Structures are given as structure tokens and as C-alpha cells.
Amino acid sequence: MLSAAEGILLSIATVEAGLGVLGNTFIALVNCMDWAKNKKLSKIGFLLFGLATSRIFIVWILILDAYAKLFFPGKYLSKSLTEIISCIWMTVNHMTVWFATSLSIFYFLKIANFSHYIFLWLKRRTDKVFAFLLWCLLISWAISFSFTVKVMKSNPKNHGNRTSGTHWEKREFTSNYVLINIGVISLLIMTLTACFLLIISLWKHSRQMQSNVSGFRDLNTEAHVKAIKFLISFIILFILYFIGVAVEIICMFIPENKLLFIFGLTTASVYPCCHSVILILTNSQLKQAFVKVLEGLKFSENGKDLRAT
């Protein structure tokens, strides 16, 4: 049985997961409908669709994995189930981080304003940058998959039990975990770098506009401030996701500490939930579609009230 604190945290995580699935499903559907309507999908539309779809899977894996560990620990420790979940998690996590990285770099190259020759060279070659990122995904996934298979083969016994035996020493597990996630860590560094550089560019540009005296300047400055806030929020949420996942991994060595494990789950679930809301509110296409949905619901509700009277 769960304690009161554990139950509250698990409820919060479940609500976050539900909102994350709804928000990302909405983003995926909007871009899918745009694809069907225009017979093509823009780069940003493709990235948003891929990010939303992969995060739906991530949310389901996070929440189902947590419920299995908390309420069905005996079945969860089976070797075959652990291997399947590990492979699916590794693949989907790579996809999620890659789409987030690509989206960050795409916005950076599109919006940022630097005079450095490397930036200008990259800005003129977005297709090559996109292809390079795709190769990064494939290579990092292949490396991670090979290490995952190697670790699984070297631990045929007690595969689901990280707390006993000599095969899963903490030091060995930590080194294996870093090697398995070296590609994801590299993508994380690229994402943070692109976001920080974009924040610097927007901040410099907003300061330059402060010398102008016009209402147009005020609108531009406000837009830049909103963009900076969005980027800072994304960075915080993205880091929280990795912290939450790391906490869940650490809990493999202390399975009796359910509160810490659920705290990690709650922390990790914040990112797919809140970032989808931020995307809907800041992306004009998604925001318009969301407003139409709300208007449709309001019209339907008014129609029911009229029929009732």
C-alpha cells in the first residue's frame, strides 16, 4: 500500500500524464490535418508532429512502468519484460530528445541574428543541418542499442533486480548507463546550447530596440520577452525531465523508497505536459486551432442549453 504522500504524488503524476497525452495528441492531430489538407508538411510541422507523437509514447511508458513497479513488482522483474521495456524506452527516448533538439536548432537558425561566419554558413544550409541531425540520431541510437544488448547479455540472472548480485554493482551500472545514453546526453548539450544562444540573440536585439521610440518597438520588445520566457521555460522543463528520469534510475538501487521513485515520475512527467501547453499557446497555428475547438465546445454547450429551455 502507498502512503498518503505517495498517493498524492502518484495522483499528480497521473494527472500530468493525462494532460500530456491530451496536449500532445492535439498537437499531432493539428499537424496531421494540415498535412492531409496541404498534401505536404513543413519542417516545423514535421518536427512538432514527431515530437508530440514520441512524447505520447514516452508518457505511456513512464506511467505504465511506474504502475507496474509499484503494484505488480513480481511480474515486472521478469527478464523478457524488462528487456522489452528497456529497448522500447531507449528508442522512444532517443526520438523524443532528437525531435526536441531539432526543433530548438531549427528555431535558432530561423530566429537568431549573429554575424559569425559559422552561423551564417549553417543558416544557409538548414537542409544539411537537418540531415546531419538525422545521422546523429541513427548513430547514437545504434551505439545505445549495442550497449543495451551487451549489458543484457552480461546479466542473464536477476535481470530485473539491481540490488543484489555482483553483476550489477553500482559503479558498473553507472558507467553502462552513461555509455547507453551518451547520444542522448550529446543531444541535450546541443539543445541547451541552441537555446542559450537564441536567448542571447533575442536579448541583444531587444536592447537595441529600446533606443527606438515607437509603439512598434514596444510590441517587438514584448514579443522578444515572451520568446525568452518560453525558451527559459523549455530549458527548465527539459532539465527537469532528465532529472526525473535519473531519479527513477537511481531508485533501482533503493526499490523500497517508493516516495523518491514517485517524485522522479512526477518530475519527469512535468515536461511532456507543460511544454505541450506552452507550444499550443505560443504557436499561432496551434493556438488558432485550440481557440476553434473551444468555440466549438462553447457553441455546442449553448445549443444544449437552448434545447433544454
From Swiss-Prot:
Disulfide bonds: none annotated. The keyword Transmembrane helix applies. Keywords: G-protein coupled receptor, Glycoprotein, Membrane, Receptor, Sensory transduction, Taste, Transducer, Transmembrane, Transmembrane helix. It holds the Pfam family TAS2R. SUPFAM superfamilies: Family A G protein-coupled receptor-like. CDD domains: 7tm_TAS2R10 (cd15021). It is found in: Membrane. InterPro entries: TAS2R. Residues 33-44, 110-129, 201-226, 282-309 are cytoplasmic. It is a multi-pass membrane protein. Several bitter taste receptors are expressed in a single taste receptor cell. Belongs to the G-protein coupled receptor T2R family. Gustducin-coupled cycloheximide receptor implicated in the perception of bitter compounds in the oral cavity and the gastrointestinal tract. Signals through PLCB2 and the calcium-regulated cation channel TRPM5. This is Taste receptor type 2 member 105.
